[in-house]
Swiss-Prot record:
Zn(2+) 1 binds at residues 70, 72, 85, 88. It is an enzyme of class 2 (transferase). Keywords: DNA-directed RNA polymerase, Magnesium, Metal-binding, Nucleotidyltransferase, Transcription, Transferase, Zinc. GO terms for cellular component: DNA-directed RNA polymerase complex. SUPFAM superfamilies: beta and beta-prime subunits of DNA dependent RNA-polymerase. CDD domains: RNAP_beta'_C, RNAP_beta'_N. Its cofactor is Mg(2+); Zn(2+). This is DNA-directed RNA polymerase subunit beta'. The gene is rpoC. It comes from Xanthomonas campestris pv. campestris (strain B100).
Amino acid sequence: MKDLLNLFNQQRQTLDFDAIKIALASPDLIRSWSYGEVKKPETINYRTFKPERDGLFCAAIFGPIKDYECLCGKYKRMKHRGVVCEKCGTEVTLAKVRRERMGHIDLASPVAHIWFLKSLPSRIGLMLDMTLRDIERVLYFEAYVVTEPGLTPLERRQLLTEEQYLTARQEYNDDFDAAMGAEAVYELLRTIDLQSEMTRLREEIASTGSETKLKRLTKRIKLIEAFLESGNRPEWMVMTVLPVLPPDLRPLVPLDGGRFATSDLNDLYRRVINRNNRLRRLLELNAPDIIVRNEKRMLQESVDALLDNGRRGRAITGTNKRPLKSLADMIKGKQGRFRQNLLGKRVDYSGRSVITVGPYLKLHQCGLPKKMALELFKPFVFAKLQRRGLATTIKAAKKLVEREEAEVWDILEEVIREHPVLLNRAPTLHRLGIQAFEPVLIEGKAIQLHPLVCTAFNADFDGDQMAVHVPLSLEAQLEARALMMSTNNILSPANGEPIIVPSQDVVLGLYYMSRALENKKGEGMVFANTSEVKRAYDNRVVELHAKVKVRITQVDVDTVDGKRTSGTSIVDTTVGRALLSEILPEGLPFQLANTEMTKKNISRLINSSYRLLGLKDTVVFADKLMYTGYAYATRAGVSIGIDDMLIPDEKKGILTEAEAEVLEIQEQYQSGLVTAGERYNKVVDIWSRTSGRIAKAMMDTIGTEKVENAKGETIDQKSMNSLYIMADSGARGSQAQIRQLAGMRGLMARPDGSIIETPIKANFREGLNVQEYFNSTHGARKGLADTALKTANSGYLTRRLVDVAQDVVITEVDCGTTEGLIMTPIVEGGDVVEPLKERVLGRVVAEDVYLPGNDEEPIVTRNTLLDEAWVAKLEDASVQSVKVRSTISCESSFGVCARCYGRDLARGHQVNIGEAVGVIAAQSIGEPGTQLTMRTFHIGGAASRAAAVDNITVKTTGSVKFNNLKSVAHASGALVAVSRSGELSVLDGHGRERERYKLPYGATITAKDGDAVKAGQAVANWDPHNHPIVSEVAGFIRFIDFVDGVTVIEKTDELTGLASREITDPKRRGAQAKELRPIVRIVDAKGNDLTIPNTDLPAQYLLPPRSIVNLQDGAAVGVGDVVAKIPQEASKTRDITGGLPRVADLFEARKPKDPAILAERSGIISFGKDTKGKQRLIIKDTDGSEHEELIPKYRQIIVFEGEHVTKGETVVDGEPSPQDILRLLGVEPLAAYLVKEIQDVYRLQGVKINDKHIEVITRQMLRKVEITDQGNSKFLNGEQVERQRVIEENARLVTRNELPAKYDPVLLGITKASLATESFISAASFQETTRVLTEAAVRGTRDNLRGLKENVIVGRLIPAGTGLAYHAGRRKASGLTDSEMETLSGKPAVAEPVATVADAGADEE
């Protein structure tokens, strides 16, 4: 009975902890764990196979080998339970205690723990304030260290060589103590008085001025504080007792043939014990010092190898020349405890097989082979057979099943009914990679999958395999049915759009049946209803594509009260669409289906169905769509042949034109009119334009055909060319691919991204010649190499993202903040890339939104969740910007609140409490990662580079508005832009912005602010190949520091006789020209300097290298004239780190190579005296204070003297560094920048991701702050702390009327942020396990198990979703608050640095 009670206690022990604390283990603690000392290196007796007494597998220490049986066999069976055999010393108990009983080794000499010594920064080194090198010299017996100077002039911790030691001994006799080896270090650590050391350091910090010293001091203070707080003692970092792992965790297994397989740990322990025993014997014999020293050093090395092999010196290898796996290796890395056994486990009740298509299945079904089902559901079948009385025992049932009797299959059917199974396809990149289905038994051996879920699984049927898992418990079945069923996952969590969308052949079928063609049989007929249409079609009276009139009955279902109203109307449609209307669910307007069913339209149809009619109807509808699509795709019989690739007749002409243009430019280049760079640029431009023209001609040829209509006129209509309908419907292929088949392949890129200027003029139908084929190989090979690299990189990015965001869970409904982000439409190059409605859909409004010019009545009030209806309302009111709540500004102390997050994208309503939004965000960003390119944006290597834009042509009629534009009026009456951030927008009649364009510096603008413009009108133009310098005043030119042949080179054009001057590169000028700075200054007629309007700065322009001046000294210039121009470099394909690496760089917050330099404050620009390699840029504040910035000469400064800049504006071109944006502009602009940059990469690949996912990750990157002024807080200046801790501490200080700490936000990359989380378990299982655990142990960190990862590792439900309720229930059941829980449990489960907790539950693999 007593044991029964014990049994339950054991079970309870594991569930009832609320935190895990890790600390240094004291020698006494290690002895208290131990069941005896291991004295001998022997393992087992090789004759009897019994463990040796006192050896590494000793039964007396670790427990019996067989259950309830002592080693010598004197006591057997349960009745002797708990007896210790007097003959062999074994306790009679269960054999599994050998998994948990530890032993110990008493070390004859102390040994430093390698983790605290070598793991940087060295903890022992910091504690003693000695360098690692010095400590190692002491430990490995190369030098003495003074442990107690006494009255001598020696210093404590001073190193002495052998000679110095002997001299000192002669000089001072025994007045001082010095020693070497770990004893010395142990002694030094033991005698440190932490309190007084702390006081001394604090005084020193106050008085010191040097940065490096301050850093070292704060590090030491933090370390000593950690020791004081955790109750660890410094001398415990040097071990005197070594714990021995329980033997069953380092097993020794006999193989056949009398050999043994053993864990490497046994070898390492054997080594330690051997050396320890030898050392003990030498000490007893009083051996000579040098021998003892050598033995001590060897002991130190063997313990080092046991704890962390290879950390110091060469790794100890076994017989097979492989390094032995030490304790540290057991827990770190992909094969370590954390990632192999705790975070990823193999599951029983699972099977895998190849998948095939199941086009007749319903969306919630999957076909499961009978063989598999029988195996998976075996226990259930056994139980049912017994209950039915078909078998008396389980054994009999087993026989029945093995014989596969007829009744077994009936029983299996019953067992399976309503019992969902989970299907999973690896790689599982997002949560839709595992979904639940109801199994349908099928013959054969392949799993059948519903075609519509292929997109979510990213599955195809070319040999993919999938795994099946059976949820066993009732709760698991419930969750599978309610949350994971494929019918519940219609919308994608990444963007809220339907993911159950027909693709490929289904789309083709639907598109084919909904196309309208001229003059088909039955055109113009009128039908009373759709069934009449069907009859006519079946009897071949009408053709599928004929245009007809049909009376359609439209039923509207009120979503609120379910009232049904129906109305009929006669609609112009086609036979196919009328047939399609039969499967539309009630309440879905027919006009949605009365179009060509391209993939986009089908997606829109399903989306509308979901929003209007809800889940159930949509699922049924999607299935019907699929069946219909397959049926009509079969009827269509679409196939492609080589004749479908029609080559346009114009191709020849267009090519001839282009070749002539190229020739002309080549001649200009040879006569010196254009530079080599310009020639290359222009040639590439001509070819990309030509390629576009041919593509357009080709699409026109393929996409239209001439037909006679019913009246006999010849008209153009969309053709039914097989290739074209595949691309047009979105079933397969794209315009870019057809272009290569039937147009011209176009420009190719080299692997480095530069474009080969000779294009491929042929297409695949004509075939490539040898040279063209060769040029193509670049792209093809690069594509393959990239794909391999990409997959690995993308997976690693996903892993980092998940790790940084894993603990972001919705924890409350509203945090009450009024902060948020201001959303405006995204406009690029004049097109609205993403309208406001798409950006704010599913967000919560942070401030009331008013109509422009009406401040009385808000259209939308604060805290409204914007759904489709609200968004439409905002659009009608032409609102241009809305402030919405964002996770970045959420003030929840742990996790985020539902209001700041907004809509749950996959469900379409406000997000539930407990949703793991962090993981969803990480998956949504990581899953499309494999679609992103590695470097370049090419289609099969074909360069996709737009021809250089050199003007603005408006696309809509409206009025012009300038934003933020500084311009001067040219004599011709046009305006010339002299600012860089200027923009031109086109507003429609309602004042709504329709287009927006950036105006480059030096652009000539032909329209005025407020002018009316017509669509197609050009409003601005500029030279795309040259960057001009524009004069802002009228006057005469004076050259300064123009020295011919030194700073400038004269060039005369043979053809025109015009002279131009090119400024040389300062690096190439001689030493005598160091001080020269070529400047163009503008003076009046008398030669006096003119000033730039509204400033007192002279009107002068510093000329950068390579700029060209076409004017002569003394020439007159007018306002807006070009003084000089700077040629632009040959442009590469838009290939500034593209794709995946760009996303990774942004999330890792890496500084770009040559970052843009931003203005540190607002003011007027001027230039000071240059230094050797730098230019001096000065920004003068309004109050007259100046800020200087030294900029390398090779960087191009894009601002001119006298220009006004605002804080955070770019002054030197480049990629801005996110840290600078945060420092100068703050958190919101940084968030906006990251979102924009990351979205640009994804948008280019056509991937849609909702902004809020990127915001969630950004929030995690901004978790930490840096203390700038500690006030009265416990933090130190320059320390990085969790923002939440500072806020809490400050709140406490304010209530006591003390000075709160001041801080700046810090941006950490995702890897750094993951390692800096509060939970050490989560950080250790991510990367750098050793470092994380070392630090945690020294600090005595306690992990409150708040995140998801920690709970998975300790084997609990995660505190998210359904697990949230479980955790709340657990707290409630104990009836305690968190803090009481902590005080009650006293010491939470303690793990010590030799990772016992991590190892105790896992078998040696």
